[in-house]
Amino acid sequence: LRLFEQGLEDGVQLYFHGQLVHGCRATKLRSEAFDAFVALPRHRDSQRAAAIPAELDYRQPRQPVNLAVVPVFPGLQASHLQALLGSGVQGLLLECYGSGTGPSDDLALLEVLRAARQRGVLLAAISQCPEGSVVFDTYAAGNRLRSAGLVSGGGMTREAALGKMVALLGAGLDVESAERWFALDLCGERA
């Protein structure tokens, strides 16, 4: 209760085992300890949205959304992504190496991503590093992923990126609008 008396930051907060954590930065690191949740440090990498449109208000009903998360790993093949993206997935969160790199020399894999984006699938990239950020311009490999249709999740955690994808796609936004709003900081998720 003392925390509430001091005032809170805007947005969602997680209170667990006497610790208050900013919801958009929270991730669970431990499964067998009471201090299971931490706020991962990330740098600010996005412009704050001037206003949130009514259709994105949290009180608005949402449609169910079919999402998938795929970590990039040695041996990831185009056929893996083709099977997943052909299953009706509306959004794919690709967990890239470091600052947003992956198997960018695999032309078949890049074509699968490009075709999914053209079909209206929202493709986003975050870093596998707990304290990482996707900056596609860092390496040529990142530029190729961006050219295939991925949008940078910047320094968002997996939890924040998935929540944002559900909010945007569940509101019925088309993929272009969803990409535009995904790139903006709406509630501290990219701060």
Predicted feature residues:
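A generic structural signal for short, solvent-exposed coil/turn residues
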Residues: Q6, P61-R62, A115
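A glycine- and small-aliphatic-rich helix-loop capping segment at beta-alpha/alpha-beta transitions
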Residues: L1, K28-F34, G142-S147
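Short, glycine-/small-residue-rich phosphate/pyrophosphate-handling segment
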Residues: L1-L14, G18, H22-T27, V175-A178
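Accessory alpha-helical/coil subdomains and C-terminal extensions
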Residues: Q13-S99, S104-D106, L184-A191
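ATP/nucleoside-binding phosphotransfer catalytic cores, i.e., glycine-rich phosphate-binding loops
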Residues: S104-A191
